[in-house]
UniProtKB/Swiss-Prot annotation:
Function recorded in the entry: Tumor suppressor serine/threonine-protein kinase involved in synaptic plasticity, centriole duplication and G1/S phase transition. Polo-like kinases act by binding and phosphorylating proteins that are already phosphorylated on a specific motif recognized by the POLO box domains. Phosphorylates CPAP, NPM1, RAPGEF2, RASGRF1, SNCA, SIPA1L1 and SYNGAP1.
Active-site residue list: 202 (proton acceptor)
Gene3D superfamilies in alphabetical order: Phosphorylase Kinase, domain 1 (3.30.200.20), POLO box domain (3.30.1120.30), Transferase(Phosphotransferase) domain 1 (1.10.510.10)
EC number(s) stated in the UniProt entry for this protein: 2.7.11.21
Protein name, as recorded: Serine/threonine-protein kinase PLK2
Record-listed ATP binding positions: 85-93, 108
Regulation: Activated by phosphorylation of Thr-236. Once activated, activity is stimulated by binding target proteins.
Biological processes annotated in GO: G1/S transition of mitotic cell cycle; long-term synaptic depression; long-term synaptic potentiation; memory; mitotic cell cycle; mitotic spindle organization; negative regulation of angiogenesis; negative regulation of apoptotic process
Gene expressing this chain: Plk2
Amino acid sequence: MELLRTITYQPAAGTKMCEQALGKACGGDSKKKRPQQPSEDGQSQAQVTPAAPHHHHHHSHSGPEISRIIVDPTTGKRYCRGKVLGKGGFAKCYEMTDLTNNKVYAAKIIPHSRVAKPHQREKIDKEIELHRILHHKHVVQFYHYFEDKENIYILLEYCSRRSMAHILKARKVLTEPEVRYYLRQIVSGLKYLHEQEILHRDLKLGNFFINEAMELKVGDFGLAARLEPLEHRRRTICGTPNYLSPEVLNKQGHGCESDIWALGCVMYTMLLGRPPFETTNLKETYRCIREARYTMPSSLLAPAKHLIASMLSKNPEDRPSLDDIIRHDFFLQGFTPDRLSSSCCHTVPDFHLSSPAKNFFKKAAAALFGGKKDKARYNDTHNKVSKEDEDIYKLRHDLKKTSITQQPSKHRTDEELQPPPTTFAKSGTSAVENKQQIGDAIRMIVRGTLGSCSSSSECLEDSTMGSVADTVARVLRGCLENMPEADCIPKEQLSTSFQWVTKWVDYSNKYGFGYQLSDHTVGVLFNNGAHMSLLPDKKTVHYYAELGQCSVFPATDAPEQFISQVTVLKYFSHYMEENLMDGGDLPSVTDIRRPRLYLLQWLKSDKALMMLFNDGTFQVNFYHDHTKIIICNQNEEYLLTYINEDRISTTFRLTTLLMSGCSLELKHRMEYALNMLLQRCN
């Protein structure tokens, strides 16, 4: 059965006035009755022509005229019926106002005469049973259902801006940012349905309803069904013919993948203004669907084409999951607005960033993170390179310097070197437990730095530790200064592998600072500025007296001058293995193509521990709640990982934060991390 199957908007409520006393509460009007308009978008289950809109001609459809005042026989509540919102196979949908509190609902009214046969009534009962248990921000809310002698009434969430079908009818096509905005919400609602083991089975523009705040709600559960194991799946063909998947047409049953297929059709239709499998006759349409044959216009950008093609894969197993869809480059590489103006219902939105700083950073983001290979790309349209473009190019050039040496460490007095008593820290836990808010002033306690720089002048000029720190600081500051305000962490979640510190020990009052990486490499930055790593095989040692000068030897056969340090290294390794737990849920993956990580500098304040590595990886662990921030560079793109108090990690592109903003809890930590980086030499 079809819930809000089609939305036919009637400008004037076309029926008798309520009693005079109730006129205002009802919002009725006294204009003459108008003839019913044909349905605009959704097709009924029995529809046969996919290309043309289907007109229902059931003039006896609703039986006798439905009364303006409707009373719930069980509660005695009185409702006033308003204008028709839409109509479908069995029912009409009306605006309906609860006269006790003036709350407006969308009421689906089904005459008993339309569901007289047992199988018809079963459909209604099944729809009610499925829909009434659903509660999600992006699913039309079911409120109440009752019956009287004439009709069944289902009270649903009222969506004042009608459906996506109406928006597309007015707009013809939508922009990519809008499509991302709506698709995110559809995916969110659909993911919830699939988690409840419910298949929608009729996803289309006419079943996505838009409320006053321009939020999308998935509706119409008339064809919805519980997810069955493959062997028990229904083989019936249902749904709107254009959006039927090959496996449903071939009577192999409907699974989650069939909803993904429909989502691909929806995305295609939003971007191009027509469905992918629209032909002049039904037989040809079905042939195209079975062969997954459709045209992909060159006007679409590559990520959009790729995502549509993956969702419209002929083989259901080749289609992406809902999580894969949200992690696709179409979402990750493009701007998604946080909210849309209601003017988008009829007018193309303007997403132009007005502030020059934001424009600069948007271009910088494209240069830094978009994988642009050379400066020439920016000179295509300008004979002369603008100052802004030069700044961007310089910024990108700085980011590519990942082989780092560092500035000579300062000689410190014994007093400065004396840290607090020995502190063994469990995965970022410290003896310092500070409950205060993270603030601007950084109170340094102790630090350690890798030994003096090599004699090469190029090393001093290009690859000093200062260069690494400055580059990370510049990118972090650029993101913080230009990202919009937001109240939550972006939805993006990348699955990527990188090295980070899972355990650490500060024994700097005697030997130095030890840490374990996620690939189980153990490193120690000794108080004398030397660095030693024990590789995951526990057999090989890498020794750095100075940056870029690495000695490699077996752990069991160390040169005489290193024996005592190797003993300390093994002690750190054993201690962390036995006593400390991992500080997060990130997978431990080793990528042998990536350079070995070693620590350039570590620094402890009264609130956090900062670690800066040779390849620009930057990690800050906060003591009081064990949250962590990790910034790393992969394929000329900066990623930020946030590990929350529950040790659950989320990874974003910095460009995503730049465009979407983030929660205050993350922003405050990013600001503190930046201050630690800037004040590291103080």
